[in-house]
């Protein structure tokens, strides 16, 4: 399997991203560090993308591959809305990406993705995808990247079913903070988004700092 390929593992170094299912929406969070080997190449790397008004995605892995997929799925989401007048359902978006990735499985995109979205029929949904199109619907939480083992430890210990978005935001920050303390390839701050019935909200650095102060006061 591709997950056992040494080259794939090399590309997977760096990054921590998390997704959390809450009773009223989805929380996504990432760190901001991009690395090239042992070099910190970027301290403000964008790893959290708004796809449309009700869907966002995190990326981990090869930057060029991930950005290409962001452009593809953003264009498809826009076309879907132009044709139907509605936003593309999150599960349809995830399935489309899965098909794109599987179609390139012999020359794979070296990425891991988390998609969070909301629609009026299915509610809040969270999906994870691997490099060859493996698609999982997550019912609690997920994490990707080199810092994910530490993040998973915090999430496993503190996640509660049907937790509120407010608690989910704090848990996302706590899991990212723990990962950044232990993983040299993750760091330089946090990006945070919430997706619920009101749409996608990307939090500012000041808002994230306020949440961190609540968590660690």
Swiss-Prot record:
Record's protein name: Proteasome subunit beta
The entry's keywords: Autocatalytic cleavage, Cytoplasm, Hydrolase, Protease, Proteasome, Threonine protease, Zymogen
Enzyme class, broadest EC rank: hydrolase
NCBIfam families (alphabetical): arc_protsome_B (TIGR03634)
Native source organism of the sequence: Methanococcus aeolicus (strain ATCC BAA-1280 / DSM 17508 / OCM 812 / Nankai-3)
GO molecular function: threonine-type endopeptidase activity
A Pfam family this chain is assigned to: Proteasome
Record entry for activity regulation: The formation of the proteasomal ATPase PAN-20S proteasome complex, via the docking of the C-termini of PAN into the intersubunit pockets in the alpha-rings, triggers opening of the gate for substrate entry. Interconversion between the open-gate and close-gate conformations leads to a dynamic regulation of the 20S proteasome proteolysis activity.
């Amino acid at each position: 399997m591709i997950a056992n390929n040494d080259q794939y593992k090399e590309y997977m170094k760096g990054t921590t991203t998390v997704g959390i299912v809450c009773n009223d929406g989805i929380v996504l969070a990432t760190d901001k560090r991009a690395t090239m080997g042992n070099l910190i190449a970027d301290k403000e790397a964008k790893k959290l993308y708004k796809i449309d008004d009700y869907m966002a995605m995190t990326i981990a892995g090869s930057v060029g591959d991930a950005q290409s997929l962001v452009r593809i799925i953003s264009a498809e989401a826009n076309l879907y809305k132009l044709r139907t007048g509605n936003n593309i359902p999150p599960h349809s978006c995830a399935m489309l990406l899965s098909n794109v990735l599987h179609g390139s499985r012999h020359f794979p995109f070296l990425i891991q993705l988390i998609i969070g979205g909301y629609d009026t029929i299915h509610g809040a949904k969270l999906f994870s995808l691997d490099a060859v199109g493996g698609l999982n619907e997550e019912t609690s939480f997920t994490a990707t990247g080199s810092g994910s083992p530490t993040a998973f430890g915090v999430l496993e210990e503190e996640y509660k079913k049907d937790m509120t978005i407010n608690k989910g935001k704090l848990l996302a920050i706590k899991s990212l903070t723990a990962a950044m303390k232990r993983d040299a390839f993750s760091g330089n701050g946090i990006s945070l988004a919430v997706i619920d019935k009101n749409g996608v909200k990307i939090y500012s650095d000041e808002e994230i700092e306020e949440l961190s102060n609540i968590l660690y006061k």
